[in-house]
């Protein structure tokens, strides 16, 4: 099964149809070079299709192959440019599925272009008939390729300096309801939340420029709220102004206006596409702005474990592309997030080097070559009563966004913000004192609530509310003595 079967010489270029594994796309003896891009695919062949042939077909169709032999291959350095599948393993506990390791020569990709990379890696091959399903699980991006990208426009260190916030997670909230508010009422929500103790507020993914609130009106009221809250609290505040629009010209216009109004941060949605994301990241770097990315739409291709693209790959692409914030899961919230898998996402965002960690879904070592770090964002169904869990699981370099957990507070928005700020600072103090804050968390919160009525109301309202559903995306690996959960 693992023997090389490549046909070489004149027979290799004889007209007609030839199996991919015989065309040079299956090379089990190949040793990947340090400069190779490596992709790990989960391949589910159609019934009766040889898994080696299926994996070789993925290599071929994502690089130089077509359905028949073409003599023009001989006009190229074909041996170099063919992607090479060098390893195929059965997926543990998933009959009929296989992990295929495929190496691509670096010269196959345009430097610094996510769009070009994805056109090959997740292009036509995902519609290939011999496959029931195909998922891109992970990638190893060589240093030589990583260095062609800008990376996060601002980075965690500079963002903290700009915000003058150190030693704790940043706090935020998404304005609710996400649609329907007038500009004046929208700005009021922003002001109350920032005045109450949050660092950021945020537009939601689908608030752009609708009949009930034009984008310019929203920007004006929001920045009036930010400036007023800053003056009252003496702290630097921000609000993510969503500049997502129909064209790049519109997005640049909105971003420039946000900058003119004094905003330190703008926001875009993942659905604008890779080229637009990189374009906005370059604008943000040039204009000293923090760039927040809402991952709107990602679950259409990241959530199912047998088909699509893993979010760990999206996180890698977005760190290359140059965003400063990305929603990366909450573990304890309402949105998809297996704890081990989510830790892998956070490590991709925040570490200079990611070692292979199979239990967290990281299949390769990844060196980030001094690219800035990307701030992960946790949002969706979290509240003050989970603060000890959030700090333990996600660390301090994270934005914790309590939308409903702020705006849904029974005493009002400002009280909701205060409850979250007091809960966080109580937990940070306990951590700094060396206490076992994870296990003592409820006790720490209860004590803090004795002198903070808003926190007591939050704990009484949401109690132990959580969303314990089984994750659809968990790591697949075979446990060994050196790799155990």
Curated annotation (Swiss-Prot):
The modification N6-carboxylysine is found at residue 202. InterPro entries: RuBisCO, RuBisCo_large_chain_AS, RuBisCO_lsu_C, RuBisCO_lsu_C_sf, RuBisCO_lsu_fd_N, RuBisCO_lsu_N_sf, RuBisCO_lsuI. The keyword Magnesium applies. It comes from the Bacteria. Its cofactor is Mg(2+). Keywords: Calvin cycle, Carbon dioxide fixation, Lyase, Magnesium, Metal-binding, Monooxygenase, Oxidoreductase, Photosynthesis. The record marks 334 as: Transition state stabilizer. The active site is at 176 (proton acceptor), 294 (proton acceptor). Mg(2+) binds at residues 202, 204-205. Substrate binds at residues 124, 174, 178, 295, 327, 379. PROSITE patterns: RUBISCO_LARGE. Binds 1 Mg(2+) ion per subunit. GO terms for biological process: reductive pentose-phosphate cycle. It catalyses: 2 (2R)-3-phosphoglycerate + 2 H(+) = D-ribulose 1,5-bisphosphate + CO2 + H2O; D-ribulose 1,5-bisphosphate + O2 = 2-phosphoglycolate + (2R)-3-phosphoglycerate + 2 H(+). GO terms for molecular function: magnesium ion binding; monooxygenase activity; ribulose-bisphosphate carboxylase activity. It is an enzyme of class 4 (lyase). Gene3D superfamilies: Ribulose bisphosphate carboxylase, large subunit, C-terminal domain (3.20.20.110), RuBisCO large subunit, N-terminal domain (3.30.70.150). Its EC number is 4.1.1.39. The keyword Lipid biosynthesis does not apply. The basic functional RuBisCO is composed of a large chain homodimer in a 'head-to-tail' conformation. In form I RuBisCO this homodimer is arranged in a barrel-like tetramer with the small subunits forming a tetrameric 'cap' on each end of the 'barrel'. Belongs to the RuBisCO large chain family. Type I subfamily. RuBisCO catalyzes two reactions: the carboxylation of D-ribulose 1,5-bisphosphate, the primary event in carbon dioxide fixation, as well as the oxidative fragmentation of the pentose substrate. Both reactions occur simultaneously and in competition at the same active site. Heterohexadecamer of 8 large chains and 8 small chains. This is Ribulose bisphosphate carboxylase large chain. The gene is cbbL.
């Amino acid at each position: 099964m693992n023997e090389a079967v490549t046909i070489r010489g004149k027979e290799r270029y004889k007209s007609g149809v030839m199996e991919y594994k015989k065309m040079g796309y299956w090379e089990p003896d190949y040793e990947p070079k340090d400069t190779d891009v490596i992709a790990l695919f989960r391949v589910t062949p159609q019934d009766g299709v040889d898994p080696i042939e299926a994996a070789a077909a993925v290599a071929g169709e994502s690089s130089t192959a077509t359905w028949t032999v073409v003599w023009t291959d001989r006009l190229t350095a074909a041996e170099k440019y063919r992607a090479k599948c060098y390893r195929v393993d059965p997926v543990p506990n998933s009959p009929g599925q296989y992990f295929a390791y495929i190496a691509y020569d670096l010269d196959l990709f345009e430097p610094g272009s996510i769009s070009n990379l994805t056109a090959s890696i997740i292009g036509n091959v995902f519609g290939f008939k011999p496959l029931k399903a195909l998922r891109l699980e992970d990638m190893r991006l060589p240093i030589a390729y990583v260095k062609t990208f800008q990376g996060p426009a601002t980075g965690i260190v500079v963002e903290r300096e700009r915000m003058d916030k150190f030693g704790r997670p940043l706090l935020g909230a998404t304005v609710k309801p996400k649609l329907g508010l007038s500009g004046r009422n929208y700005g009021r929500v922003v002001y109350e939340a920032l005045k109450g103790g949050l660092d950021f507020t945020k537009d939601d993914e689908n608030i752009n420029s609708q009949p009930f609130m034009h984008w310019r009106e929203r920007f004006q009221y929001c920045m009036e709220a930010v400036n007023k809250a800053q003056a009252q609290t003496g702290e630097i505040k921000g609000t993510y102004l969503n500049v997502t629009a129909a064209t790049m010209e519109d997005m640049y216009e909105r971003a420039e206006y946000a900058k003119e109004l004094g905003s330190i941060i703008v926001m875009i949605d993942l659905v604008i596409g890779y080229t637009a994301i990189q374009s906005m990241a370059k604008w943000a770097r040039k204009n000293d702005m923090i760039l927040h990315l809402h991952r709107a739409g990602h679950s259409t291709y990241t959530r199912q474990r047998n088909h699509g693209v893993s979010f760990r790959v999206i996180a890698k692409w977005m760190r290359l592309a140059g965003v400063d914030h990305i929603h990366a899961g909450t573990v304890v919230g309402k949105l998809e997030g297996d704890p081990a898998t989510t830790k892998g996402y956070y490590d991709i965002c925040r570490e200079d080097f990611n070692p292979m960690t199979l239990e967290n879904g990281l299949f390769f070592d990844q060196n980030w070559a001094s690219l800035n770090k990307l701030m992960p964002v946790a949002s969706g169904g979290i509240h003050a009563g989970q603060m000890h869990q959030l700090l333990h699981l996600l660390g301090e370099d994270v934005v914790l966004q309590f939308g409903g957990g702020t705006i849904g507070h029974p005493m009002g928005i400002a009280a909701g913000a205060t409850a979250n700020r007091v809960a966080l600072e109580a937990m940070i103090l306990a951590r700094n004192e060396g206490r076992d804050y994870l296990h003592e968390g409820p006790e720490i919160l209860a004590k803090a609530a004795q002198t903070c009525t808003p926190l007591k109301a939050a704990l009484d309202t949401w109690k132990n509310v959580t969303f314990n559903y089984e994750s659809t995306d968990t790591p697949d690996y075979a446990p060994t003595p050196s790799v155990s959960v």
